Amino acid sequence: MKKIIALTALFFIGFFFAQEPIKALSKEDIPPEVSKIVDISSLTFIVDTQPSFPGGMAAFRKEFSQNFDTSALEKPKTGILKTVIYYAVEVDGSILQIKAVGESDSFNKEAERALKSIKTKYYPAKVNNLAVRYLLRMPLNMNFK
């Protein structure tokens, strides 16, 4: 039992510190497989205020990691699983149109499922103090040793 707890703690420590900051996207940054899911024509790319999660990114990562089920993954013996999750933050702050792009289908599906299960709404992006749809990108890496 102690080994399971230690491995789980090691996973989450690696998960939290392996992330890159979320950056603003342009239409050119969006992969074709994401363009098929997300209605790009209704997105705003230049905003006055970025969308933000209540409690900040630490609260978002905590909620995401609590929803992430590592037992659903096809785990390699060693190496790194990588995916990039794209998701639209709607004008009401809800998360919709989620697509994970990476090499491992099981990792992509679990990342999408974990994000869909987050019920807390974002504070939406704003232009001229009006809420707008905005696309976020979150890289996700998981190390196996």
PLM features: what roles do these ranges have?
Residues I5-A6, F17-K145:
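Charge-biased low-complexity segments
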Residues I13-G14:
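N-terminal signal peptide c-region/cleavage motif recognized by signal peptidases
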